[in-house]
């Protein structure tokens, strides 16, 4: 799969913004976790940009989406003498105290994708609400093409706090205003593919016609659930498609990389 060009370009800009610095200085990249393909791709882009700029970028992300681990990563970056931190915050508040301490220590903060409530040098992200609306429109197109003009839609998201995925969900919901579809209460899988699959399987048992995934783990879980369900006709739409083998390929008609939609055959 092609890398997300816009993401790589943003990383170059982020690194430049984070360093009105001399070559050889250190930048910490702290994302929500270190296993989501989105963040792995982000790190790959950061490493390429760092090589061009002559700075060092260290991927210091937690193993899983955990506020305490992310706070520890921020503290370790400050203790390690890093001049800048590029961070995708799990939520707006949890790591704010740690980031404030980093700023007080002279560390520059740059947000990518998901900001916290601490002033930063810059924030780089896609228009997640607009991208979410596009995802909703893609689902409506796919459902209409399948002759489905009403029914329940499930949502599998990460949590109720992460800025980027909350906005994606809001945009997705807005696409269905004035339609005969019914958006069910959101269920949270913490970005974990296995948990998200269980949620999606429950939605399918309830008879939904479509399921939306707010991030890569959610989308992977939805795809696995749709595959396991057989020929149910459930339509899945999600974000941040993985470079890993895709058991849901051909069953997930629209997967979004940042804000750019991609449609696969049904």
Segments predicted by a language model, with ranges:
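A residue-level marker of the well-folded mature domains of exported/periplasmic proteins
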Residues: 4, 13, 20-266
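Positively charged n-region of N-terminal signal peptides that target proteins for export
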Residues: 1-9
């Amino acid at each position: 799969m092609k890398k997300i060009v816009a993401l790589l370009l943003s990383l170059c800009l982020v690194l430049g913004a984070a360093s009105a610095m001399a070559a050889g200085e250190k930048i910490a990249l702290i994302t929500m976790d270190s296993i989501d393909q989105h963040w792995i791709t982000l790190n790959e882009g950061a490493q390429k940009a760092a090589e061009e700029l002559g700075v060092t970028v260290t991927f210091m992300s937690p193993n899983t989406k955990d506020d305490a681990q992310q706070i520890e990563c921020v503290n370790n970056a400050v203790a390690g003498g890093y001049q800048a931190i590029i961070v995708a915050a799990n939520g707006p508040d949890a790591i704010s105290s740690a980031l404030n301490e980093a700023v007080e220590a002279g560390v520059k903060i740059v947000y990518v994708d998901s900001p916290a409530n601490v002033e930063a040098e810059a924030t780089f992200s896609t228009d997640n609400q607009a991208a979410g609306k596009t995802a909703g429109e893609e689902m409506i197109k796919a459902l209409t093409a399948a002759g489905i003009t009403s029914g329940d839609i499930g949502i599998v998201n990460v949590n109720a706090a992460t800025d980027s995925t909350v906005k994606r969900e809001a945009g997705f919901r807005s696409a269905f205003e004035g339609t005969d579809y019914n958006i069910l209460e959101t269920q949270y899988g913490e970005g974990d593919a296995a948990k998200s699959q269980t949620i999606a399987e429950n939605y399918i048992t309830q008879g939904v016609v479509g399921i939306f995934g707010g991030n890569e783990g959610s989308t992977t879980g939805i795809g696995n659930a749709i595959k396991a369900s057989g020929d149910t006709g459930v339509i899945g739409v999600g974000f941040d498609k993985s470079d890993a083998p895709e058991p849901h390929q051909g069953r997930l008609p629209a997967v979004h990389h940042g804000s750019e939609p991609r449609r696969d055959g049904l």
